[in-house]
Swiss-Prot record:
This is Serine/threonine-protein phosphatase 6 regulatory ankyrin repeat subunit B. Keywords: ANK repeat, Repeat. Gene3D superfamilies: Ankyrin repeat-containing domain (1.25.40.20). The gene is ANKRD44. PANTHER family: ANKYRIN REPEAT AND PROTEIN KINASE DOMAIN-CONTAINING PROTEIN, SERINE_THREONINE-PROTEIN PHOSPHATASE 6 REGULATORY ANKYRIN REPEAT SUBUNIT A. It comes from Gallus gallus. ANK repeats lie at residues 7-36, 40-69, 73-102, 106-135, 139-168, 172-201, 205-234, 238-267, 271-301, 305-334, 338-367, 371-400, 404-433, 437-466, 470-499, 531-560, 566-595, 599-628, 633-662, 666-695, 699-728, 732-761, 768-797, 800-829, 835-864, 868-898, 902-931, 938-967. Protein phosphatase 6 (PP6) holoenzyme is proposed to be a heterotrimeric complex formed by the catalytic subunit, a SAPS domain-containing subunit (PP6R) and an ankyrin repeat-domain containing regulatory subunit (ARS). SUPFAM superfamilies: Ankyrin repeat (SSF48403). SMART domains: ANK. Putative regulatory subunit of protein phosphatase 6 (PP6) that may be involved in the recognition of phosphoprotein substrates. It comes from the Eukaryota.
């Protein structure tokens, strides 16, 4: 909030501050604006209310001042008057209808302000006008919270007397008691507890009032709560007790009090850390640690990750505390779960004094930690030369490798502190020692662009052209030093932009400096690794422009030589990774810009695919071809750019492309791909360049087919505006209308339909005779069906005899079927397809009972037979659809005596497929012996079939109904044949 100079304010404001009513009247009479706003949107009435001058407030209001005006923090004059504890001002404002429920930007009402500012009289005036004193602000705090936080005992008393909820909690579930305890207001704490406040209440993170008091060192509150008998070792959600919190915050007096009251000094939290761990690590925990150790705290207790209190002192360099722990029995070489001792940790963080304390106390400097590294490894890796010097003084085998074969010299080279390298070399470290991947310390120094380390190692005789297991030399690693990784660490936020740029430039210079030094010392840039990549490839891949320039100076033919040695040329690598400056260097010396990688892709293809517009521009300006196709998909750079919607790249390519409709292996044009992927800008640009909207791929699909299929609305609209053909058919005869109906795009379907029906040759059948109505019904798109049925053209079935009604019921789209019947005629329920099957057959085939009910309610013929003589019941029975069979037998009363062309009844068919439940449902309605023993064309009775398929319950039921066990089929087999469970045996059991 700005502080304004009074002399710069309007005369009316100055008069209010001077308290001169006569001058104010005169100014108002001279038409001074009583509602004028300052820079903070405060009015003269805000000023008067702040000053608490009731007479001037009255005068301003009577002169037209707005009583509920809000400043830019939404504070009203009433808020200001209450904050100033002016009882008279509050009374005047309320008399003139000031809003007692007005909220500022923090949702605080005048009562909140009164509670926070100890405006007791003001609160007494306001409260009778409120419906509740428990209104919360944006943080969920009530007036009681504010009074407790600020220690206003009388205000707390008043609020409680007026019905304040003593256990109301804010958005973090903190009660007024939490805030009073944290701030150390003993009288308020006692008052709240006496009025029934829950002394063991917890906030969302499990903190109790005891935790709150302990964290802020409120010793009197802690004593009071302990005297009330609260659980001293109560934990929050992290498992921390009040003792943990006190130690973490360095509250030694509270720690002493808690220990005296019997707090568990070895209580672990959820991660296994005790109060001693916290005291060892915290900034002000020295006295806390002394108290804990003197009261029996276990100095060697370990957390879940194996860290002892001594480890914690090592992390933060608390060497005095480490001495205390060691003197009290702290195990100096205890290891955490990674195998690190406190000495490893101290070396990692560079705490020389602590290292000295540990070594003096007998710490093992040759102890292996994480990955079998010495403390010296960690000190060297993190460039702590003083720590290295201290650790070297203890003496051990300096070239001992870790789990990856790396010596301390490898670590120092990676860390980049040349002093560490010199110390190790002077102690006899072998600079040609290799790790398990064949890398020397020089490889590590080069990979991290540590120039002085490289210089030192080379000067002392390191082999500059030594190759590792991948065939890479230090020169390869220097060329491949990763600037992008540094960028990722810094992030891409606006505030880091300048630092990012500086870091990038610095790393580029370092890489060039390292490369130049290596080249001057006879490093061979032509050496290829096992993948055929040389230094040029790596410099190009990682975008080191200066490195490439150095290499060009060294050997002008080197770039051309690099193009034929590996699957990808330097040009490809620079283009793919978007390094346009490196690319420009390469382009200066390369002849063939259209060289292909192993998949036939050019550098321009890769740059376009990745969206690197600057690289695309550089390649085009040097004459790279935009029409070269790869070997796999036969795509061009135009196709590559639209796949990911890289419109800037596409625009550059189209400026030099002769044909925007070039096709790939599937016959797809860039426009088709742009529409398919929904890249609106790319579609717009291609249409501007007059790309063909009616071109079809090898399957006959156009861009419009793709747009409708993928649902990209704006792309479709742009195509329609170009008068695209909407009746074009794909290889299966489907038009965009078919696709719209199949995908449920009713709006497009309506628009396309209007255009289609206005054309002379309007054929809307695909190669199988299916119309858009078939497709809409099959996929259950009611909105599309509604659109189609609005046209008389679709109010009669035509096309494939497997009608739209068949399509609807076979997929259980009951509403769609109902719409068809209502719009056309109920007679369609008995229409037949080429095999003589009705929609009832289709519904029975798919076991859709609701559709069966619908069809039969519109007089579908339940016993209609198809060309094979099968009824709907037979369909359901043969396919084992219990629901459909049950409905057709028991509700629809289907004829059970009907037979198909092979003389099978529905019972035969159910039994033949092993559908026992269906067979039993049918059998339950059969009493006639003629049906029980009915024979099909193979002379088989239901008993033959049931017995052969092992349907025991069906066999039992058939026998109970008198089925003949002596019936013989055409193979002279009786129903008790050897392949089945014996029907005769079943009869004997009965």
């Amino acid at each position: 909030m700005a502080v304004l100079k009074l002399a710069d304010q309007p005369p009316l404001v100055q008069a209010i501050f001077s308290g001169d009513p006569e001058e104010i009247r005169m100014l108002i009479y001279k038409t001074e604006d009583v509602n004028a706003l300052d820079a903070e949107k405060r009015t003269p009435l805000h000023v008067a209310s702040f000053l608490g001058d009731a007479d001037i407030i009255e005068l301003l209001i009577l002169s037209g001042a707005r009583v509920n005006a809000k400043d830019n923090m939404w504070l009203t004059p009433l808020h200001r008057a209450v904050a100033s504890r002016s009882e008279e001002a509050v009374q005047v404002l309320i008399k003139h209808s000031a809003d007692v429920n007005a909220r500022d930007k923090n949702w605080q009402t005048p009562l909140h302000v009164a509670a926070a500012n100890k405006a007791l009289k003001c609160a007494e005036i306001i409260i009778p006008m409120l419906s509740s004193v428990n209104v919360s602000d944006r943080g969920g705090r009530t007036a009681l919270h504010h009074a407790a936080l600020n220690g206003h005992v009388e205000m707390v008393n008043l609020l409680l007397a007026k019905g304040a909820n003593i256990n109301a909690f804010d958005k973090k579930d903190r009660r007024a008691l939490h805030w009073a305890a944290y701030m150390g207001h003993l009288e308020v704490v006692a008052l709240l507890i006496n009025h029934g406040a829950e002394v063991t209440c917890k906030d969302k993170k499990g903190y109790t009032p005891l935790h709150a008091a302990a964290s802020n060192g409120q010793i009197n509150i802690v004593k009071h709560l302990l005297n009330l008998g609260v659980e001293i070792d109560e934990m929050n959600i992290y498992g921390n007790t009040a003792l943990h919190i006190a130690c973490y915050n360095g509250q030694d007096s509270v720690v002493n009090e808690l220990i005296d009251y019997g707090a568990n000094v070895n209580q672990p939290n959820n991660n296994g850390f005790t109060p001693l761990h916290f005291a060892a690590a915290s900034t002000h925990g020295a006295l806390c640690l002394e108290l804990l150790v003197n009261n029996g705290a276990d100095v060697n207790i370990q957390s879940k990750d194996g860290k002892s209190p001594l480890h914690m002192t090592a992390v933060h360099g608390r060497f005095t505390r480490s001495q205390t722990l060691i003197q009290n029995g702290g195990e100096i070489d205890c290891v955490d779960k990674d195998g690190n001792t406190p000495l490893h940790v101290a070396a990692r963080y560079g705490h020389e004094l602590l290292i000295n304390t540990l070594i003096t106390s007998g710490a093992d400097t040759a102890k292996c930690g994480i990955h079998n590294m010495f403390p010296l490894h960690l000190a060297a890796l993190n460039a702590h030369s003083d720590c290295c010097r201290k650790l070297l003084s203890s003496g051990f085998e300096i070239d001992t490798p870790d789990s990856f074969g790396r010596t301390c010299l490898h670590a120092a080279a990676a860390g980049g502190n040349v002093e560490c390298i010199k110390l190790l070399q002077s102690s006899g470290a072998d600079f040609n020692k290799k790790d398990k991947r064949g890398r020397t310390p020089l490889h590590y120094a080069a990979a991290n662009c540590h120039f002085h380390c490289i210089e030192t190692l080379v000067t002392t005789g390191a082999n500059i052209n030594e190759t590792d297991d991948w065939g890479r030399t230090p020169l390869h690693y220097a060329a491949a030093s990763d600037m992008d990784r540094k960028k990722n660490i810094l992030g891409n936020s606006h505030e880091n932009a300048e630092e990012l740029e500086r870091t990038s430039e610095m790393k580029e210079k370092e890489a060039a400096l390292c490369l130049e030094f290596l080249l001057q010392n006879d490093a061979n840039p032509s050496i290829q690794d096992k993948e055929g990549y040389n230094t040029v490839h790596y410099a190009a891949a990682y975008g080191h422009r200066q490195c490439l320039e150095l290499l060009l100076e060294k050997n002008s033919n080197m770039f051309e030589e690099s193009d034929s040695s590996a699957t990808k040329s330097p040009l490809h690598l620079a283009a793919y990774n978007g390094h346009h400056q490196a690319l420009e260097v390469l382009l200066q010396s390369l002849v063939d810009l259209d060289i292909k990688d192993e998949k036939g892709r050019t550098a321009l293809d890769l740059a376009a695919f990745k969206g690197h517009a600057e690289c695309v521009e550089a390649l085009i300006s040097q004459g790279a071809s935009v029409t070269v196709k790869d070997n796999v998909t036969k795509r061009t750079p135009l196709h590559a750019s639209v796949i990911n919607g890289h419109t800037p790249c596409l625009r550059l390519l189209l400026e030099v492309a002769d044909n925007p409709d070039v096709t790939d292996a599937k016959g797809q044009t860039p426009l088709m791909l742009a529409v398919a992927y929904g890249h609106i800008d790319a579609v717009s640009l291609l249409l501007e360049k007059e790309a063909s909207v009616d071109a079809a791929d090898l399957l006959g699909c156009t861009a419009l087919h793709r747009g409708i299929m993928t649902g990209h609305e704006e792309c479709v609209q742009m195509l329609l505006e170009k008068e695209v053909s909407i009746l074009c058919k794909d290889a299966r005869g489907r038009t965009p209308l078919h696709f719209a109906a199949a995908r449920g795009h009713a709006t497009w379907l309506s628009e396309l339909l209007q255009i289609a029906l206005s054309e002379e040759d309007c054929s809307l059948k695909d190669n199988q005779g299916y119309t858009p109505l078939h497709w809409a019904c099959y996929n259950g798109h009611e909105n599309c069906i509604e659109v189609l049925l609005e046209q008389k053209f679709f109010r009669k079935f035509y096309g494939n005899s497997f009608s739209p009604l068949h399509c609807a019921v076979i997929n259980d789209h009951e509403n769609c079927a109902s719409m068809l019947i209502g719009a056309i005629d109920a007679s369609i329920v008995n229409c037949k397809d080429d095999k003589g099957r009705t929609p009832l057959h289709a519904a029975a085939f798919a076991d859709h009972v609701e559709c069966l009910q619908l069809l039969l309610s519109h007089s579908a013929q339940v016993n209609a037979v198809d060309h094979a003589g099968k009824t709907a019941l037979m369909m359901a029975a043969q396919n084992g659809h219990v629901g459909a069979v049950d409905f057709l037998v028991n509700i629809a009363k289907a004829d059970l005596t009907l037979r198909d062309k092979d003389s099978n009844t529905s019972l035969h068919l159910a039994s033949s497929k092993g559908h026992e439940k269906c067979a039993l449902l049918i059998l339950d309605k059969i009493q006639e012996q003629s049906l029980i023993n009915a024979k099909n064309n193979s002379l088989q009775t239901p008993l033959h079939i049931a017995a052969r398929n092992g349907l025991k319950m069906v066999v039992e039921e058939l026998l109970a109904k008198g089925a003949c066990v002596l019936a013989v089929d055409e193979n002279v087999s009786r129903s008790n044949g050897p392949r089945t469970s014996s029907a005769t045996d079943v009869q004997k059991e009965e």
